[in-house]
Swiss-Prot record:
Quaternary structure (record): Heterotrimer of A, B and C subunits.
Function as written in the Swiss-Prot or TrEMBL entry: Allows the formation of correctly charged Gln-tRNA(Gln) through the transamidation of misacylated Glu-tRNA(Gln) in organisms which lack glutaminyl-tRNA synthetase. The reaction takes place in the presence of glutamine and ATP through an activated gamma-phospho-Glu-tRNA(Gln).
Gene of this entry: gatA
UniProt KW Magnesium keyword: no
InterPro entries: Amidase, Amidase_CS, Amidase_dom, AS_sf, GatA
Full protein name: Glutamyl-tRNA(Gln) amidotransferase subunit A
Pfam families per record: Amidase (PF01425)
Enzyme Commission no: 6.3.5.7
Coiled-coil stretches: none
């Protein structure tokens, strides 16, 4: 199956019309993964036997005509727990962890008939922007295998971009869906905080984490978000709002839509080619009937320090549970209880995770709480207010997703501050709990450029409508990478 030339709807039609069976489709998917992933290394574990068993059962009962996702495979980021299937968060700490329950999003995907293909590589505990922090392997960018795929959902993006699956799930705490989507030339959506249940997502920063879909097209993305959204009694932060059909009205266009472009998102560090691509996108939206104005989000410049204080503080609390006693990695030949704690955590966690735990613990300490964590929380409120003020007059915000295109493997891994600045344009969206989308908007030296659309809370439908209009007016999403070739 050539996933570059198909979408969810076309494959569903083929399955309903019995051009091929679900089992044949699933076998073809695994055959392709085994060929392509030798170079990309997006998957940490495949679930072939159970996937084929489920495919056969769907063939026996017949593919549901009213469920577009029925019988189609999906890849899952390895911090989303999957019953009886190893879930590691790409950490030595959880190397052999087999959950006894499913994340809520997994139950929802199963209800929709989707087939879990396998678990995807990521930065350890979702801490990173390049997928180089994985304890197990480094995933490559299909457009240039010497480049990173972004992170932390690098495996999720690379698997879709390289045609191994049509859709995947990732998580986004500070840009971890949108930045890899931009680096790989695909569509990635971070939903509104509370739109999708976090139950079963291995926690990084609980006030920021959100699960979302990565796909090749905007409409496919909306279809997957339809399936995973909704209130969940297991997650007290999940919204009880009714979930609309995100595909409804997606083709209505942007005529009359008011779009804001923040001047702060084109500052120092934004590549010239990236800025030009986004400004070209502005012209496209204007030609489609939208009104586009420059505005200011003055407190966004504080986003990176605010984020790394809050996220690291929450991480230091969430990761206390990995102590060498309850579950997870336990150091060998320990001498006493203190040795169990110290050595298990020292040996089980990677450098970046330990760095953030230390930063968070410091920020929460008695002598630093007021100066750091409390102050960061106050500035976070100002960032939220900036967005609220803009949305009084505008329907959508348009900006670059990442300041640059994908950089080389090994180029920034030893410079944490430079690495952290990769998220400067995506972090404010998480701090404000807003929905954000990255979609393809051009190329620079053969590498994809991402356009970011940011909507008001629970206005994903507006974001999808604008994204679809742009996608249909351009050909960037149709570009197919040449694996191992010249792009």
């Amino acid at each position: 199956m050539d996933y570059f030339k198909n979408d969810l709807a076309s494959i569903h039609d083929d399955l309903v019309n019995k051009k091929y069976s679900v089992e044949e489709l699933t076998k073809s998917t695994f055959d392709n993964i085994k060929k392509v992933d030798k170079e990309i290394e997006a998957f940490l574990k495949l679930d072939e036997e159970r996937a084929l068993e489920k495919a056969r059962k769907i063939d026996e009962r017949g593919v549901k005509a009213d469920s577009i996702l029925d019988g189609i495979g999906i890849g899952i980021k390895d911090n989303i727990v999957t019953k009886d299937l190893t879930t590691t968060a790409a950490s030595k700490m959880l190397e052999n962890f087999e959950p006894i329950y499913n994340a809520t999003v997994m139950d929802k995907l199963n209800d929709a008939g989707m087939i879990t293909v396998g678990k995807l590589n990521m930065d350890e505990f979702a801490m990173g922007s390049s997928t180089e922090n994985s304890a197990f392997k480094i995933t490559k960018n299909v457009w240039d295998t010497t480049k990173v795929p972004g992170g932390s959902s690098g495996g999720s993006a690379a698997a879709v971009a390289s045609g191994q699956v049509l859709a995947s799930l990732g998580s986004d705490t500070g840009g971890s869906i949108r930045q890899p989507a931009a680096f790989n030339g695909i569509v990635g959506v971070k939903p509104t905080y509370g739109r999708v249940s976090r139950y079963g997502l291995i926690a990084f920063a609980s006030s920021l984490d959100q699960i979302g879909p990565l796909t090749r097209t905007v409409k496919d993305n909306a279809l997957v978000l339809n399936a995973i959204s909704g209130h969940d009694a297991h997650d007290f932060t999940s919204s009880s709002r009714e979930v609309p059909d995100f595909t409804k009205g997606i083709e209505d266009g942007v005529k009359g839509m008011r779009i804001a472009v923040p001047k702060e998102y084109f500052g120092e560090g934004v590549d010239e080619d990236v800025a030009k691509a986004v400004k070209d996108a502005v012209k496209t939206f204007e030609s489609l009937g939208a009104t586009v104005d420059e505005i200011s989000l003055p407190h966004s410049k504080y986003g990176v320090p605010v984020y790394y204080i809050i996220a690291s503080s929450e991480a230091s609390s969430n990761l206390q549970r990995y102590d060498g006693i309850r579950y997870g990695f336990r150091a060998k030949d320990v001498k006493n209880l203190e040795d169990v704690y110290v050595r298990s955590r020292s040996e089980g966690f990677g450098d970046e995770v330990k760095r953030r735990i230390m930063l968070g613990t410091f920020s929460l300490s008695a002598g630093s709480y007021d100066a750091f964590f409390k102050k960061a929380a106050q500035v976070r409120t100002l960032i939220c207010q900036d967005f609220e003020n803009v949305y009084k007059d505008y329907d959508l915000i348009l900006a670059p997703t990442s300041p640059t295109t994908a950089y080389g493997i090994g180029e920034e891994i030893n410079d944490p501050v430079t690495m952290y600045m990769n998220d400067i344009l995506t972090i404010p969206v998480n701090l404000a709990g807003l929905p954000g989308m990255s979609l393809p908007a051009g190329f620079s030296n053969g590498l994809p450029i991402g356009l970011q659309l940011i909507a008001p809370r629970f206005a994903e439908s507006t974001m999808y409508r604008a994204g679809y209009a742009f996608e249909q007016s351009t050909d960037f999403h149709k570009a197919i990478p040449t694996l191992g070739g010249q792009n």
